[in-house]
């Protein structure tokens, strides 16, 4: 839903005209590109004749629907990030393109330093095998923060509403982001938009979704921060790197060495990403 809402907001800001779920118009105008942003069930809503731009809120892997291009008149599939494109490319070749949705930089803004009362927001998005990772990853991070005298609070993916996250970001000076991998990573990008630098666990390795790995799909490398540069913060791959990574990261936070919001403004605004989406739409019209 966030992808759909932010795409619409971006299209509104650049003055683009569009229709929402107007299936009757699509049926009457079969030459017009149908942009199906949502999940695959929408593809079965009717017998499409329109050329379809599908994504970026798609299914997890092409093996879920290997005959998709034969079943429906899909011309291009959008995925949120580069590593996902590489995973899909052997199946659908050049029909796969990268498109990330934009971040609302007017809503996710930097708070005044005087509001910052907590050093670290520990963002827990561990999706699988959490019982194993709790004692060997999460608890050691807590211990490092305690030993370094840093105050912290925790937030867990799926257990908050956006406004709670936004409030937490306004009160925290930095964030530690824990996730096996991200296709885009809207939440950490919202933090970057708030000018909150991030120390991210980015261990690479295989795509770990247990519905696919290792019995159906073995793909590597993946990333937990697919949109990133040195302005955003720092990364560590394993817990034994944290002893050096944390103090270096914190020192740079204190000295103002990071500028994460600049990265978002340069790459992932609502307007920039909506314009990129229109480019994909027009590429089908011109084909």
Where are these regions (language model features)?
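Active-site proximal beta-strand in glycosyltransferases
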Residues: 32-62, 76-78
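N-terminal pre-catalytic "stem/leader" segment of glycosyltransferase-like enzymes
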Residues: 1-40, 275-280, 285-287
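A charged, aromatic-enriched C-terminal amphipathic alpha-helix characteristic of glycosyltransferases
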Residues: 235-282, 286
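Conserved donor-binding/catalytic loop of nucleotide-activated donor transferases
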Residues: 171-172, 190-196, 201
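Aromatic "clamp/platform" in nucleotide-sugar-dependent glycosyltransferases that forms part
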Residues: 180
């Amino acid at each position: 839903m966030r992808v759909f809402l932010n795409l619409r907001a971006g299209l509104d800001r650049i003055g683009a005209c569009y229709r929402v779920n107007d299936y009757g118009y699509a049926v009457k105008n079969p030459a017009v590109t149908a942009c199906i942003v949502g999940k695959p069930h929408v593809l079965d809503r009717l017998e499409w004749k329109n050329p379809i731009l599908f994504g970026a809120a798609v299914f997890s892997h092409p093996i879920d629907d290997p005959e998709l291009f034969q079943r429906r008149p899909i011309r291009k599939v959008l995925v949120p990030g580069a590593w996902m494109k590489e995973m899909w490319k052997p199946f659908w070749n050049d029909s796969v393109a990268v498109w990330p949705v934009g971040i609302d930089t007017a809503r996710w803004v930097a708070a005044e330093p005087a509001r910052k009362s907590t050093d670290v927001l520990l963002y827990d998005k561990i999706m699988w095998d959490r019982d194993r990772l709790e004692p060997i990853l999460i608890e050691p991070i807590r211990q490092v923060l305690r030993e370094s005298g840093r105050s912290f609070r925790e937030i867990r993916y799926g257990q908050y509403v956006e406004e709670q996250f936004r409030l937490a970001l306004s009160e925290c000076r930095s964030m530690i982001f824990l996730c096996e991998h991200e296709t885009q990573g809207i939440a950490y990008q919202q933090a970057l938009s708030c000018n909150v630098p991030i120390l991210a666990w980015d261990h690479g390795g295989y795509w770990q979704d247990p519905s696919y790995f290792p019995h159906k799909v073995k793909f590597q490398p993946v990333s937990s921060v697919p949109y990133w540069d040195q302005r955003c913060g720092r990364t560590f791959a394993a817990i034994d790197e944290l002893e050096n990574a944390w103090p270096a990261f914190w020192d740079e936070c204190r000295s103002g060495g990071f500028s994460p919001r600049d990265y978002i403004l340069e790459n992932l605004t609502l307007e920039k990403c909506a314009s990129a989406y229109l480019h994909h739409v027009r590429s089908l019209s011109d084909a």
